[in-house]
Amino acid sequence: MKPANEIELSEVIRGANGPLRIVGGGTRAIGPLNAGEVLETGALSGISLYEPGALTIVAGAGTPLSEVEAELAKGGQRLPFEVPDLRGLLGRDGASTIGGVVSANAAGPRRIQAGACRDSLIGVRFVDGVGTIVKNGGRVMKNVTGYDLVKLLAGARGTLGVLTEVAFKVLPRPEVEATLTLDGLDPTAAVTAMAQALGSPFEVTGAAYLDGQVCLRIEGMAGSVAYRSAALVKLLGAGWDVADAAHSAKLWSEIRDMTPFVGKPGAVWRISVKPSDMPQVLATLNEAQTLCDWGGGLIWARVPDVNDAQAVTLRACLAALGGHATLVRASDSVYATTPAFHPEPAGLAALSASLRAKFDPRGILNPVGMG
């Protein structure tokens, strides 16, 4: 099913007799695909408003991300949160949609400075599980529902409603960027260096650690970037190299899109943890290739795709640390016994169930979309 507009979508959901699997570009699904009839949002497409002076863009949920980014580039602007393209990692085709970005609350390396997708999202329209059309945020800021639906819909993976339109605040594109790199650091030294850089006044917009190398990005006007890069090197000590804009852009696109893992076998974990706990988590993993982003707060790990892909050991470690792990890629045999999404604590699970009962009382929208 591919409804042509919001009214048709409402009618489809209202008349549904079973589960619906919501598909945008089909590029960000995690774990086994949901059962149910496919409901495509691709026809809910198009940029309805772009006001560069107001730093605002509004688009249909089915609008290709590339179309949104191209329009913003014409105005010298961009989405603040640096959307990852994980098609290579996940082995997916298709074109990512802006609604899919919101549903996954996708965010790349710049999250440490600009926030996640939900932090730039200012308005949504969606159809809930009984076919009601709902609008929240944007130009109508009064919240009459008692819920901050803008924040709730970001990251809900379609379990609370089918997005039809999204509105974002956007930011100017920086003039240049540069990246400081230092090789030969162990995880503890890497976390210390990244924390020192992120705690400085020099506005670091990327802090990653891979293959023993720490990478720190600075963006802005040319003069400012040159000054801040030099000042950061002075703060951190000798030995740092400074990559120019072209090399910096290539490096961070590879970090953002997980290029080091593309084409390599294995299960892949996406782990969220306090940056200071990064070394302990890395020590827990066996035979793992890792890439750490967000100053150590996000760990990507490629491990052997056998048994439970180290789920029991990893999640036990994270339970003690207050972190969580999502199995974003694995074989069917691993997924058969290992939930893709981290088990929720009892209180959070009850809250999630209550929200789903409110917005989708029949439980038909992406019924296993969150594990």
Question: Could you say what each language-model-derived stretch is?
Answer:
Residues S103, I122-P265:
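C-terminal substrate-binding/cap subdomain adjacent to the FAD-binding core in PCMH-type
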Residues R21-R28:
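Glycine-rich beta-strand-to-loop/alpha-helix junction loops that act as flexible
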Residues G62, L216, A301:
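Residue-level signal for inorganic ion chemistry
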Residues N34, P52-G53, D128-V130, L210-G212, ...:
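Short acidic-glycine loop/turn motifs at beta-strand connectors
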Residues P32-A35, G239-G371:
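Conserved glycine-rich FAD pyrophosphate-binding loop
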